[in-house]
Amino acid sequence: MSVVDFSKLYPDNRQEGETVLRQAQLVMLRMLKIIDYICRKHDISYWMCSGTLLGAVRHKGFIPWDDDLDICMIREDYERFVEIAVNEFPEDMMLQTRETDPHYHYLPLPCKVRDKKSFILSPGYEDEECEKGLFIDIFPMDRYHKQKLPFMFEKMVKVYNTFICKSLDAIYFKDESIRSEEHTS
């Protein structure tokens, strides 16, 4: 288990949410901060995608009705993350793969990070015996051109810096920063 006391670094503030949806979003935001901490510690790159990215850009947080978070990693970083995260997560979180949860059958998505203190039913999976806490989906990216990837990333960073925020040190979800000032590499 983790040697970092995430309960102090990123306290569980789910009860501060005024609605069930907001409580779920606060849980996922805490989970994302912990994922970010682990990724930074181990030099693992990731990026937000889908509605998560749209919410961060358009709403400076979650899309108001959004109930999930999605991130991507290139395959090499994804494989390292899966290997490392199992031992880094606090007790109230888990890495859900077919190896860590034999009842997990959400294919083709090979990995989720789950909150173990919550419960969510996904349509069509009510009878499954797998863990069912709130989750963050992690999508491994397999097809990319190695020589074009740095160029594409550089373009994304320029767009990000120009239109979204002044620095890649933090992404703000309302008043919550994903990149913690408390974190030291």
Regions found by a protein language model. Give the residues of each.
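Short hydrophobic/aromatic beta-strand micro-patches
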Residues: 72-74
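A short secondary-structure junction signal
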Residues: 148-154
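Conserved oxyanion/phosphate-binding beta-strand-loop segments in alpha/beta enzyme cores
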Residues: 1-4
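Active-site nucleotide-donor binding segment shared across nucleotidyl transfer reactions
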Residues: 36-69, 78-79
